[in-house]
């Protein structure tokens, strides 16, 4: 049970200026520059982080390469790597509340969700891949009896990882844990707006015994640090979660440099499809509201398009409005808050523009959408439901990354499929129906990396998360994630 007094004791702890973590040491940026960290809770600065440049990235990559070639981690026995990664998981769990509160101060996620999704998920991820280290085998090819064909899986070398601001510890672990499990060294760039929890993770990894240089963390802007990692000739693989525009740029950087493998988890405009035979409309309304309004809609798999069969449209919209209206938006470190803050002033301004544009284009505002709690100095927005949305409207096509839900009515199953697949994205989706046949047909028909049936969200580490089409390539989570961080090598042996 979360204790409000413990949360309150952590929320005001001073945060010392944060340095870069390179070659197992904390050091300032080469240029001596720093960045103010603004809390979305009250709009005030509460910390400073180093602003790295190209020289710092080069130092981090050099340290990572030296560690990889030296073999302190890459050639460590799997049992040894496993032991250290399990220790990392234990330390994350031991400091879970501290990490969660720090992350909330950084990006505004409501504390109940943050505790589970950030340190809780990160610890589970490190434990999952630690246990996988000694359970992934090579292969023996079916060759002629005069030849032995062995297929080895090797670490790729140096991995660059660029992580977003919305769930930095969770998504960071999704990149780091499988990359480390495979024996790689890593250069990690957190988001400029949310770096603090990943810097703490670096300290935890060092305490757990991860050899120096195996993990390096460089903070700063995407235009400087991100570009320097993506264009570096000695980075072998780049893993990124973020916007489509940046993803395209990273592919260009790969082509301009060493043709490094680039894995992208990008945006979404995920359809949540409700048929008239959905088993429980109250549950549909509650789960669908959580699917778009948790973390103020700042979730890549958010169910931002609600496609509702026309015969139940009015009833479901009414129930959904009731659920949304009951959500308490407020201080994300207050256990009474259901929804926290928008991550930044810029993000809030963008959300408000989307809301105004939706009304201008003819959508009907059912509830919410306005900025609230402005007197706190923080960045808060009431969850918004827009009805009578057509597929031509901006709100139906573009990712908002905020608490704005577009409701679109449909008549027949074919219409639902057409609408679901009408965007450039293909990350997540859901289908609500009592018909097993309908469920199976929709799973096949909807072009998305994950199709929920009679639920939304909550998939665990046992299944991959990745997108289709312009939602990206490659997958986080599951054993399939290891494929991104390994290379195949064939030994062809004449007997």
Give, region by region, the residue ranges found by the protein language model.
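Residue-level signal for inorganic ion chemistry
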Residues: 43, 81, 103, 126, ...
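Hydrophobic face of amphipathic alpha-helices that form TPR/SEL1-like repeat modules
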Residues: 1-41, 67, 370
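A short hydrophobic/small-residue beta-strand
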Residues: 185-187, 365, 450
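Glycine-rich loop-to-alpha-helix module at the N-terminal edge of alpha/beta enzyme cores
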Residues: 46-136
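ALDH superfamily catalytic-core signature
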Residues: 237, 245-390, 453
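Conserved C-terminal structural/oligomerization subdomain of aldehyde/semialdehyde dehydrogenase
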Residues: 44-47, 235, 371-373, 380-495
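Rossmann-like NAD(P) dinucleotide-binding subdomain of oxidoreductase/dehydrogenase enzymes
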Residues: 137-283, 410
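Short, well-ordered beta-strand elements within core beta-sheets of diverse protein domains
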Residues: 45-52, 69-73, 161, 272-276, ...
């Amino acid at each position: 049970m979360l204790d409000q007094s413990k949360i309150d004791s952590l929320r005001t702890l001073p945060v010392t200026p944060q340095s870069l973590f390179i070659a197992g040491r904390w050091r300032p940026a080469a240029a001596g520059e720093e960045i103010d960290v603004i809390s979305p809770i009250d709009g005030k600065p509460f910390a400073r982080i180093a602003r790295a440049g190209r020289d710092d990235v080069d130092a981090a990559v050099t340290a990572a390469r030296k560690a990889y070639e030296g073999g302190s981690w890459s050639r460590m026995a799997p049992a040894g790597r496993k032991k250290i990664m399990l220790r990392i998981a234990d330390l994350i769990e031991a400091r879970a509340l501290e990490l969660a509160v720090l992350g909330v101060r950084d990006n505004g996620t409501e504390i109940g969700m943050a505790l589970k999704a950030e340190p809780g998920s990160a610890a589970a991820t490190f434990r999952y891949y630690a246990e996988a280290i000694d359970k992934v085998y090579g292969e023996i090819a079916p060759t002629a009896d005069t030849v032995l064909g062995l297929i080895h899986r090797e670490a790729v070398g140096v991995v660059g990882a660029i992580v977003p601001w919305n769930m930095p510890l969770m998504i960071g672990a999704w990149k780091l844990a499988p990359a480390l499990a495979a024996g790689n060294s890593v250069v990690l760039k957190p988001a400029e707006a949310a770096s603090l929890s990943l810097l703490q993770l670096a300290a935890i990894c060092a305490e757990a015994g991860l050899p120096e240089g195996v993990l390096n963390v460089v903070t700063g802007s995407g235009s400087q640090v991100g570009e320097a990692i993506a264009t570096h000739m000695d980075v072998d693989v780049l893993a990124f979660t973020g916007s489509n525009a940046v993803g395209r740029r990273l592919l260009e950087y790969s082509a301009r440099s060493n043709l490094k493998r680039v894995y992208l988890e990008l945006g979404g405009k995920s359809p949540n499809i409700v048929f008239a035979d959905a088993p429980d409309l109250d549950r549909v309304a509650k789960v669908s509201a959580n699917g778009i309004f948790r973390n103020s809609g700042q979730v890549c798999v958010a169910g931002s398009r609600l496609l509702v069969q026309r015969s139940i449209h009015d009833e479901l919209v009414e129930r959904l409005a009731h659920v949304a209206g009951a959500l308490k938006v407020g201080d994300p470190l207050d256990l009474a808050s259901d929804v926290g803050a928008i991550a930044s002033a810029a993000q809030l301004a963008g959300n408000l523009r989307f809301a105004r544009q939706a009304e201008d284009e003819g959508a009907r505002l059912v509830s919410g959408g306005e900025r609230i709690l402005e007197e706190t100095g923080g960045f808060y927005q009431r969850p918004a439901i827009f009805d009578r949305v057509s597929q031509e409207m901006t709100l139906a096509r573009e990712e908002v990354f905020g608490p704005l839900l577009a409701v679109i009515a449909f008549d027949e199953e074919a219409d639902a499929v057409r609408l679901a697949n009408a965007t450039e994205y293909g990350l997540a989706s859901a289908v609500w129906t009592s018909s097993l046949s309908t469920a199976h047909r929709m799973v096949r028909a909807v072009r998305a990396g994950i199709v929920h049936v009679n639920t939304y969200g909550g998939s665990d580490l046992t299944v991959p998360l990745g997108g289709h089409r312009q939602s990206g390539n490659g997958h986080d989570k599951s054993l399939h994630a290891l494929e991104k961080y390994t290379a195949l090598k064939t030994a062809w042996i004449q007997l």
